[in-house]
């Protein structure tokens, strides 16, 4: 089963085993990870599941959709090249070991 490591702004790390097909946001909520609010429940409508995905992981996910791109413009924490909505990131064996950094704030 793939693992995802969530890194808080203070450097605290939480490693979670995630079944393939589950979204990075769902895994965080299920594991009780603070820092993912997910107000819209994963519909890409609120930008409160914003995370930073660094290389080489960023290239293993589909490109940002127009909808996700628009929502990322409304994040509370600064948008960077690494910004993604975790509700749009589906875990697969290709991303085993994925590291996502959580922003300072979501709302």
Swiss-Prot record:
Keyword Iron carried by entry: yes
UniProt cofactor(s): [2Fe-2S] cluster
Record SUPFAM superfamilies: 2Fe-2S ferredoxin-like
Stretches assigned to the 2Fe-2S ferredoxin-type domain: 2-106
Disulfide bonds listed in the record: none
InterPro entries (alphabetical): 2Fe-2S_ferredoxin-like_sf, 2Fe-2S_ferredoxin-type, Adrenodoxin-like, Adrenodoxin_Fe-S_BS, Beta-grasp_dom_sf
GO molecular function, one term: metal ion binding
GO biological process: one example: P450-containing electron transport chain
Keyword tags: 2Fe-2S, Electron transport, Iron, Iron-sulfur, Metal-binding, Transport
Free-text remark on how the cofactor is bound: Binds 1 [2Fe-2S] cluster.
Free-text function comment from the UniProt entry: Ferredoxin-type protein which transfers electrons from rhodocoxin reductase to cytochrome CYP116 (ThcB), which is involved in the degradation of thiocarbamate herbicides.
Stated name of the protein: Rhodocoxin
Organism: Rhodococcus erythropolis (Arthrobacter picolinophilus)
Primary gene name: thcC
């Amino acid at each position: 089963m793939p693992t995802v490591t969530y890194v808080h702004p203070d450097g605290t790390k939480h490693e979670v085993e995630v079944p393939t097909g589950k979204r990075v946001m769902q895994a965080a909520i299920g594991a009780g990870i603070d820092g993912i609010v997910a107000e819209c429940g994963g519909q890409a409508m609120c930008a409160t599941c914003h995370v930073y995905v660094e290389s080489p992981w960023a290239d293993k996910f589909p490109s940002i959709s127009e909808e996700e791109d628009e929502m990322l413009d409304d994040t509370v924490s600064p948008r960077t090249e690494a910004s993604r909505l975790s509700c749009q990131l589906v875990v697969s064996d290709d991303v085993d070991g994925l590291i996502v950094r959580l922003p300072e704030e979501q709302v």
